[in-house]
């Protein structure tokens, strides 16, 4: 775990599946921005009938204060199905530009009614027990994340569904996974995602649809990277995150990937060195996707961003004098 001195900011990814009525949701949506402002916390929190899901960053005291506020308001306990699941990491600077609390139909969008992890969910697997499970040849390991996430890192031998969004998972499960299970007859399924929320909902779906014995990694990849030593790890590559860090390495520090600001996909240093890459304008993934007028507009935007960055750096240098 990296040193988190006074200059570092705490980043917390969290979720809880807990039923919220209209009054509870409105109370949270009203109180969270005030709580965040008092603690200098930035980020995003989704509030729905099924619970809360968010990632926030800021001074440690402010972030922990907001998490405590959520724990109290939601009246959560310590059972798997009712706790506020939190993954913590650190950053040198803010990874968000603002704070938003938003009302949503689902805290992670699958688009299937009747899926409730509180009522029906797979077996939770702690990070220290994950290696033994996935090393078993009778275990079918599934990465429930999107294709652009799996492209930069995953567990050894995991199946990549190749989805564009989590909404695609049920269709993939019915059209690809079910025939695969019929053919190979694995003893169990083991699933994982970034922080645990998607695989928890996916395992609930598979259980409900009769896919057999289903397990999922508690706390997701982030908790695994936090608790399992790198020399014992089955993880390969970097873990995509939905904030300005883009990806994290095994030490939960910002990795080497950055986003193409034209298409939004992550790029490795090698991909950024290709002739097809023009910063802010195009990359190997989108070179044929946009029109010439689009690329001119992207180039103008990049020049403006570079000018703002240069001006900001000059102000910092002047202040340091």
UniProtKB/Swiss-Prot annotation:
Catalytic activity annotation: uridine(34) in tRNA + AH2 + O2 = 5-hydroxyuridine(34) in tRNA + A + H2O
What this chain does, per the entry, is described as: Catalyzes oxygen-dependent 5-hydroxyuridine (ho5U) modification at position 34 in tRNAs.
Q: Where is this region: Disordered?
A: 301-321
Active site, UniProt feature: 193
> Any one Gene Ontology biological process term?
tRNA modification
Q: Does the keyword Oxidoreductase apply?
A: yes
The name of this protein is tRNA uridine(34) hydroxylase
Q: Which residues form the Rhodanese domain?
A: 135-233
Q: Which UniProt keywords apply?
A: Oxidoreductase, tRNA processing
Per the record, the gene is: trhO
| Family classification | Belongs to the TrhO family.
Recorded hits in NCBIfam families, A to Z, give: PRK00142.1-4 (NF001136)
For this protein, what is the EC number?
1.14.-.-
Q: Which PANTHER family match?
A: RHODANESE-LIKE DOMAIN-CONTAINING PROTEIN 7-RELATED, THIOSULFATE SULFURTRANSFERASE/RHODANESE-LIKE DOMAIN-CONTAINING PROTEIN 2
Q: Which GO terms describe its molecular function?
A: oxidoreductase activity, acting on paired donors, with incorporation or reduction of molecular oxygen
What organism is listed for this UniProt entry? Parasynechococcus marenigrum (strain WH8102)
Q: Where is the signal peptide?
A: none
Q: Name one Pfam family in it.
A: UPF0176_N
